[in-house]
UniProtKB/Swiss-Prot annotation:
Its EC number is 2.3.1.74. The gene is PKS3. Belongs to the thiolase-like superfamily. Chalcone/stilbene synthases family. Pfam families: Chal_sti_synt_C, Chal_sti_synt_N. Transmembrane segments: none annotated. The active site is at C164. It catalyses: (E)-4-coumaroyl-CoA + 3 malonyl-CoA + 3 H(+) = 2',4,4',6'-tetrahydroxychalcone + 3 CO2 + 4 CoA. Homodimer. The lineage of its organism: Eukaryota, Viridiplantae, Streptophyta, Embryophyta, Tracheophyta. This is Polyketide synthase 3. Keywords: Acyltransferase, Transferase. GO terms for molecular function: naringenin-chalcone synthase activity; protein homodimerization activity. Polyketide synthase producing p-coumaryltriacetic acid lactone (CTAL) and slightly naringenin chalcone. Can use p-coumaryl-CoA as substrate. One of its GO terms (biological process) is flavonoid biosynthetic process.
């Protein structure tokens, strides 16, 4: 007779969860940040609000973003004028867009990841799908399963309305699924479109304008599995540990509320301070088992949030400027894509590591950290182990 313990042992993988492929995608519509204030105030018929426009111009100038990608074009917004007002009922129009476009953009990123992985998509056993853009039943996980032609028996998990920390959550879940299910290959997808948050300006809700200055659209996909097949699968990073915590005294620091007017965004000014004040505690807890206390000895993947968060984290930890270079570059080239950002940064780090001739996928270093920050304030901390870089 086989015991339960024997069954459990047989179900578990031997090695750590490993990222085997990464794919990214954006909508084709590219928006230049330098001209965005003129466009935004024109399309929302708010050009007469000159003082508010000047404030928004300053926000965009300070954002350190060069360009963003957006599904919403001028044509789409002209066809849906309610989305251009500050508080007009518009959820139906927004939902009609995102329930179609979120899985489509996710498919683009997933297709690239599957191609890099090089295996049959029938070997994907689990699907984790994450979005803060729109809610539907059956969800985007179901739609993506159909779009990609995955097996009907693929085990799906749908994550809605988590926000900017969720790229870390996706990695944490994929790690647990891969390590506790021998032979599992997990496709994890983050797909975000700002059609749910776009709205006109308001004098009394300046934090909404911060969101209009920062957020962009993008999707990223990874494939995660333990015990990579030699000479068939190419490891990129190993997922060593993953933790989540709610920061003290941070209630209401970042909120989003789904209403008839879409998803409203609320932000307190002390968010950068709250994150920078607490980040070392998360680092100490994550790296104590490895006896690492030099944060400059790590490669860094941090959700960009906005430039103020990065500046304060850098100063608080005494990080060298190059540590957050990949993070700042993704913010500059794409804006804040919510949950997808950290996976874009992970992709950038491994690609530049190869291009620059580093010995490992982590900029030549062995250990790294991935941080996700978002509503709560919630922080996800993932410890990464690089592997030998291969061209």
């Amino acid at each position: 007779m086989v015991t339960v313990d024997e069954v459990r042992k047989a179900q578990r993988a031997e090695g750590p969860a490993t990222i085997l492929a990464i794919g990214t995608a954006t909508p084709p519509n590219c928006v230049d940040q330098s001209t965005y204030p003129d466009y935004y105030f024109r399309i929302t018929k708010s050009e007469h609000r000159t003082e508010l426009k000047e404030k928004f111009q300053r926000m965009c100038d300070k954002s350190r973003i060069k360009k963003r990608y957006m599904y919403l074009t001028e044509e789409i917004l002209k066809e849906n004028p309610s989305m251009c007002e500050y508080m007009a009922p518009s959820l139906d129009a927004r939902q009609d867009m995102v329930v179609v476009e979120i899985p489509k953009l996710g498919k683009e990123a997933a297709t690239k990841a599957i191609k890099e992985w090089g295996q049959l998509k029938s070997k994907i056993t689990h699907l984790v799908f994450c979005t803060t853009s729109g809610v539907d039943m059956p969800g985007a996980d179901y739609q993506l399963t159909k779009l990609l032609g995955l097996r009907p028996s693929v085990k799906r998990l749908m994550m809605y309305q988590q926000g900017c920390f969720a790229g870390g959550t996706v990695l944490r879940l994929a790690k647990d699924l891969a390590e506790n299910n021998k032979g599992a290959r997990v496709l994890a997808v983050c797909s975000e479109i700002t059609a749910v948050t776009f709205r006109g300006p308001s004098d009394t809700h300046l934090d909404s304008l911060v969101g209009q200055a920062l957020f962009g659209d993008g999707a990223a996909a990874i494939i995660v599995g333990s015990d990579p097949l030699p000479d068939i699968e190419r490891p990129l990073f190993e997922l060593v540990s993953a933790a989540q915590t709610i920061l003290p005294d941070s209630d209401g620091a970042i909120d989003g509320h789904l209403r008839e007017v879409g998803l409203t965004f609320h932000l307190l000014k002390d968010v950068p301070g709250l994150i920078s004040k607490n980040i070392e505690k998360s680092l100490n807890e994550a790296f104590k088992p490895l006896d690492i206390t030099d944060w400059n000895s790590l490669f860094w993947i941090a959700h960009p949030g906005g430039p103020a968060i990065l500046d304060q984290v850098e100063a608080k930890l005494g990080l060298k400027p190059e540590k957050l270079e990949a993070t700042r570059n993704i913010l500059s080239e794409y804006g804040n894509m919510s949950s997808a950002c950290v996976l874009f940064i992970l992709d950038e780090v491994r690609r530049k590591s190869v291009a620059n001739g580093h010995k490992t996928t982590g900029e030549g270093l062995e250990w790294g950290v991935l941080f996700g920050f978002g509503p709560g304030l919630t922080v996800e901390t993932v410890v990464l182990h690089s592997v030998a870089a291969s061209t």
